[in-house]
Amino acid sequence: MDLKQYVSEVKDWPSAGVSFKDITTIMDNGEAYGYATDQIVEYAKEKNIDIVVGPEARGFIIGCPVAYSMGIGFAPVRKEGKLPREVIRYEYNLEYGTNVLTMHKDAIKPGQRVLITDDLLATGGTIEAAIKLVEQLGGIVVGIAFIIELKYLNGIDKIKDYDVMSLISYDE
């Protein structure tokens, strides 16, 4: 299935000059959403995954059905102040400022094999932060899966030491 046909491109959103890749048009088509989920599950099966991790919010949309299909758990990565129990945190730089992501301190057990999922790889900052959190807890990132990779933003450079799969890629 050509998933690219289900991606909506929204010009000049969220700011002028940006062509936003909207995956909600994959999600609202049961066949396309199911296909995307199944492709990631097939990728993950080879890796003996113990748990799926996804950053908010679209990482939840991708990771939860994958975890459910595999009969394993899902651990969220969230913005600071959104998780109720004791957390670990990772602060990283943005173009104009910083951002903080957190995970529950007990979300990953040392040695667990982890698949990280998200909707889109752009600059790689968010996924790099998720990797750092998983590894801080002793997890082993054995795969990273995206629906879309924006190759022209070179986010893959930040995660080049990991096994990464993307279902759709855009060169420009």
UniProtKB/Swiss-Prot annotation:
Pathway: Purine metabolism; AMP biosynthesis via salvage pathway; AMP from adenine: step 1/1
Known catalytic reactions: AMP + diphosphate = 5-phospho-alpha-D-ribose 1-diphosphate + adenine
GO biological-process terms attached to the record: adenine salvage; AMP salvage; purine ribonucleoside salvage
InterPro entries given in the database record: Ade_phspho_trans, PRibTrfase_dom, PRTase-like, UPRTase/APRTase
PANTHER family assigned to the protein according to its UniProt record, in alphabetical order: ADENINE PHOSPHORIBOSYLTRANSFERASE (PTHR32315:SF3)
Protein name (Swiss-Prot/TrEMBL): Adenine phosphoribosyltransferase
Major localization class: cytoplasm
Known role: Catalyzes a salvage reaction resulting in the formation of AMP, that is energically less costly than de novo synthesis.
Localization, UniProt: Cytoplasm
Organism: Staphylococcus epidermidis (strain ATCC 35984 / DSM 28319 / BCRC 17069 / CCUG 31568 / BM 3577 / RP62A)
An annotated Gene Ontology molecular function: adenine phosphoribosyltransferase activity
Quaternary state and interactors: Homodimer.
UniProt keyword Ribosomal protein present: no
EC number per UniProt: 2.4.2.7
